């Protein structure tokens, strides 16, 4: 549970303000668990208002689901990625990536990429290619490894994956060791490093789409895998209430 007090009601520390506003973000590995936790948070807020004889109002902002992987589509995307090859960089781009890499004061001891944590073979591969995690930006493709292990993050692609077979890839749009949500990541957004990797991702997606149109048996296999998982997981539960309306973040209630 994350929270931010967006409006304390006033500046005076010795006064009980007439109103206050707080933003909560409730997260879990499975969307159904997040929704149950959200209901509990709502009940706690209501109970607190009853204890203080105040009025509680709530406004839903947004929500997204966990992502359901599809091995058939992921394998196909990896094959196309492997055929197209990874991006390579100019001396100027490598110099820029190195400067950002060096600016990260607290570097992680982990190797780049989640898969290195799940497979000894991939760990050794990444360790060699990244020179023990010291390469500023990666220029290699990690071997494919199917995994249902949860990865932390939030994306509306998760909701799509509950409705149709879905797969994703990652390209090197920012330097290694740059923490998520960091200024180092943001600093790469308008660079040629990010642009060429975005174009590469588009090519991989396009090539995969062509394969699915030309190979209906592969598309059917992806659908079969999707249907089996939906039967196992119980189908899609939309985290957004039917009466929800768009909200401007930070807007006073």
Regions found by a protein language model. Give the residues of each.
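Midchain, well-structured core segments that form catalytic/ion-binding scaffolds
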Residues: 1-114
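An extended, acidic, His-containing surface patch that forms the Zn2+-binding/catalytic region
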Residues: 64-253
């Amino acid at each position: 549970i994350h929270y931010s007090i967006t409006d304390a009601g006033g500046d005076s520390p010795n006064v009980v303000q007439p109103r206050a506003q707080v933003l909560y973000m409730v997260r879990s590995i499975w969307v159904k668990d997040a929704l149950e936790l959200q209901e509990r948070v709502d009940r706690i807020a209501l109970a607190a208002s009853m204890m203080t004889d105040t009025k509680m109002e709530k406004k839903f902002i947004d929500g997204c689901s966990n992502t359901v992987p599809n091995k058939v589509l992921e394998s196909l995307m990896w094959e196309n990625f492997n055929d197209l090859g990874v991006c390579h960089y100019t001396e100027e781009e490598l110099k820029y990536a190195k400067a950002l890499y060096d600016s990260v004061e607290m570097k992680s001891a982990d190797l780049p990429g989640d898969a290195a944590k799940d497979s000894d073979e991939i760990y050794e591969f990444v360790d060699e290619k990244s020179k023990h995690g010291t390469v500023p930006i990666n220029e290699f493709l990690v071997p494919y490894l199917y995994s249902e292990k949860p990865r932390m993050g939030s994306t509306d692609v998760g909701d799509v994956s509950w409705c149709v077979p879905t797969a994703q890839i990652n390209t090197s749009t920012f330097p290694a060791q740059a923490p998520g949500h960091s200024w180092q990541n943001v600093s790469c957004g308008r660079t040629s490093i990010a642009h060429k990797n975005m174009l590469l991702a588009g090519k991989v997606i396009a090539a995969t789409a062509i394969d699915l149109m030309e190979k209906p048996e592969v598309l059917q296999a992806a659908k079969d895998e999707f249907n089996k998982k939906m039967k196992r997981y119980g189908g899609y539960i939309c985290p957004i209430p039917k009466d929800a309306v768009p909200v401007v973040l930070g807007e006073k209630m």
